[in-house]
Amino acid sequence: MGKKQVAPPRALPPMPSLKDEIPLSRSKKKKSKSNNVPDDLLQNAGFNTSENKDPLSPERRKKKKKRLSIDAETSLTQHNPALPVVQNGKDTDNQAAEEGTTRKPRRRTKKTRSVGQEFPNELGVEDEDIIPDGHTKIPEQNPAFLASSLTSQPVGKFFVEKNRRFQAADRSEIIKTTEQTDVFLDVKPTWTSMDVSLTAHHIFRMVGLFCCGFLAGYAVWNIVVVYVLAGSQLTNLPNLLQTYKILAYPSQCFLYFLLVLSTITAFDRIDLERTADALRGLLKLDPAALASFFYFVALILALSQQMTSDRINFYTPPTENGSLWQANTEEQILQPWIVINLVVALLVGLAWLFLSCRPDIDHTEEAMFIPEGEDYPDMEKGTKIQG
């Protein structure tokens, strides 16, 4: 009992290890926000993306340390005797644990906007544009535009654009130039295909009428020459053969040519498209129809005597060798030929007489001028009455 035991210095209770109780939170990688801007625009704008993909950690906040009471400290040392001793009132282990733990930042979710909300509704209807029934919106007219609706006063000068410049011109000069152009257009009208065809038709009709008159005179001259050379009662037929054999071939060819041309001219005056009307005109003694019929018959009769004309052209006396003529056969061969030439001359003369009485008659031209709607007016009236 000699010595008094000295108590050791009181040791502070160890702090609980945060490593054992609280697990360290691992740093999570932040998801990169979806950016609507394409990468090409970022590269063109000059922004370089960082190579480090780790998210930036938020700033660390110092956590205030709560001081424990003496009773709490003793209780902690009793329950956890393995806790380290705090030196100088500072806990190094706690600081290391605090540095390891990071606080999770709160993320603010952005609401996605629809495409229609990003742009203004340009096609929308405003309230001002809606007009109720019974109310019409009268546009306000500017008084400057009202003056243009008034009647303008005639001015003596006009401004005409010439060579990309406006030059003043008198009204009288412009009226004279317009009158001259109107006269020029009246003098030289435009020709159509119908005008050309009708003009050609008129020219051919005039030429054909002249040929018909010339044919009538030539046929009469031919028959007069034949009767003069044959003598009275056809007693001098050998004289006719010896004299006319030089004229037989050329005269007959010329007669055929005139007959063909006159026949075409006569048929051109009637409308051959309507054969019923042509036959009806022949029965009604139409001059154009009768002339065409006479010319056609004369042409057939003249062609029927072509062989006799050839024998007259090659005439040699019957006494010579190789002669086509036999003795005492001249009258038997020449008498029908003379009669037919006389009939041809009469037919041609009558046809010319009919045409000369009505030279302007032309049913083909009338058919070309009459419109299609006026062809059958009676039938149209009948259909209207039935309707």
UniProtKB/Swiss-Prot annotation:
Chain segments annotated as transmembrane: 209-229, 246-266, 282-302, 337-357
An annotated GO BP: regulation of Wnt signaling pathway
Pfam families given in the database record: TMEM237
Comp. bias intervals (Basic residues): 103-113
GO cellular component terms, A-Z: ciliary transition zone; membrane
First and last residue of the signal peptide: none
Compartment list: Membrane; Cell projection, Cilium
S-S bonds: none
Domain of life: Eukaryota
Topological category with respect to the lipid bilayer: Multi-pass membrane protein
Entry keywords, A to Z: Cell projection, Cilium, Cilium biogenesis/degradation, Membrane, Transmembrane, Transmembrane helix
Residue numbers spanned by region Disordered: 1-116
Main location: membrane
Family note: Belongs to the TMEM237 family.
Purpose of the protein: Component of the transition zone in primary cilia. Required for ciliogenesis.
Name of the protein in its database record: Transmembrane protein 237
Organism of origin: Xenopus tropicalis (Western clawed frog)
